[in-house]
Amino acid sequence: MKNLILAIESSCDDSSIAIIDKNTLECKFHKKISQELEHSIYGGVVPELAARLHSEALPKILKQSKKYFKNLCAIAVTNEPGLSVSLLGGISMAKTLASALNLPLIPINHLKGHIYSLFLEEKISLDRGILLVSGGHTMVLYLKDDANLELLASTNDDSFGESFDKVAKMMNLGYPGGVIIENLAKNAKLKNISFNTPLKHSKELAFSFSGLKNAVRLEILKHENLNEDTKAEIAYAFENTACDHIMDKLEKIFNLYKFKNFGVVGGASANLNLRSRLQNLCQKYNANLKLAPLKFCSDNALMIARAAVDAYEKKEFVSIEEDILSPKNKNFSRI
């Protein structure tokens, strides 16, 4: 019975392939190879290196999934947004597979995929607010009951996750910065350093991390010898201020929209400080909080496969001749 969908994710620095049963939503296969170690010496993702590593990793993963090929009914792939050279690797493989196996091709928006990480084993439920925080995006969305997406707030500059990466790089801590800063902050012995919360007195529903990032840079310059205790203190102050900023704007949004259901997705949503605060916020406003599983917060092909199940039912197929590569976020108005 041909009831399986194979999905490929390669939008940034994770090479991943998943296979899902479109009828039961059972994950039949999922494998991810991260490039974090290779990029860590540069303090961030190097696009050309990412592309080369995808070209090595994706075929290795695909080979492990071959036993499911006879039961495939479609091929899905992340086509937007992301690094062009990274996306291209996944798209090329998906088109080759779709052509060779004579299967329909389904392009999936990466951010939609993150939303589906809330519903990996269940039908998607609408009418909810969503916070998406990752290395490339910070936004609050309203997923309406007609499946339309309304953008309520986004960042004016850096993303939440990106700011962690950049602060980690300033202190020569490595990459990715999220977990490094979070763990370092737990070791803070002194808590005398503080930063102003961005846009605290602004009514604008938007995020901005560039000013906070610069404040951290100036604080670092005050110290001739940046020892581990000072690094931990800076990490603590930065993490808490970044979370303060997210919660400050979310509080304003909750007051306006009175959400009964709220979801949190994206790689940076794995931050435990942020998760704890979100739980408190939703308790305060009597909203049901749904968090993406920690294992599937970061980029993965299973969320792409899950999104593809619904896209398959709607017959959202494209020709393999069509140019579907889009580094920018074009198709993101509906689920």
Curated annotation (Swiss-Prot):
Keywords: Acyltransferase, Cytoplasm, Iron, Metal-binding, Transferase, tRNA processing. Its EC number is 2.3.1.234. Fe cation binds at residues 110, 114, 299. It holds the Pfam family TsaD. Disulfide bonds: none annotated. It comes from the Bacteria. Its cofactor is Fe(2+). One of its GO terms (cellular component) is cytoplasm. Required for the formation of a threonylcarbamoyl group on adenosine at position 37 (t(6)A37) in tRNAs that read codons beginning with adenine. Is involved in the transfer of the threonylcarbamoyl moiety of threonylcarbamoyl-AMP (TC-AMP) to the N6 group of A37, together with TsaE and TsaB. TsaD likely plays a direct catalytic role in this reaction. Coiled coil: none annotated. GO terms for molecular function: iron ion binding; N(6)-L-threonylcarbamoyladenine synthase activity. Substrate binds at residues 132-136, 165, 178, 271. Binds 1 Fe(2+) ion per subunit. It is an enzyme of class 2 (transferase). This is tRNA N6-adenosine threonylcarbamoyltransferase. It catalyses: L-threonylcarbamoyladenylate + adenosine(37) in tRNA = N(6)-L-threonylcarbamoyladenosine(37) in tRNA + AMP + H(+). The keyword rRNA-binding does not apply. InterPro entries: ATPase_NBD (IPR043129), Gcp-like_dom (IPR000905), KAE1/TsaD (IPR017861), Peptidase_M22_CS (IPR017860), TsaD (IPR022450). It is found in: Cytoplasm. The keyword Acyltransferase applies. The gene is tsaD. GO terms for biological process: tRNA threonylcarbamoyladenosine modification. It comes from Campylobacter jejuni subsp. doylei (strain ATCC BAA-1458 / RM4099 / 269.97). Belongs to the KAE1 / TsaD family.
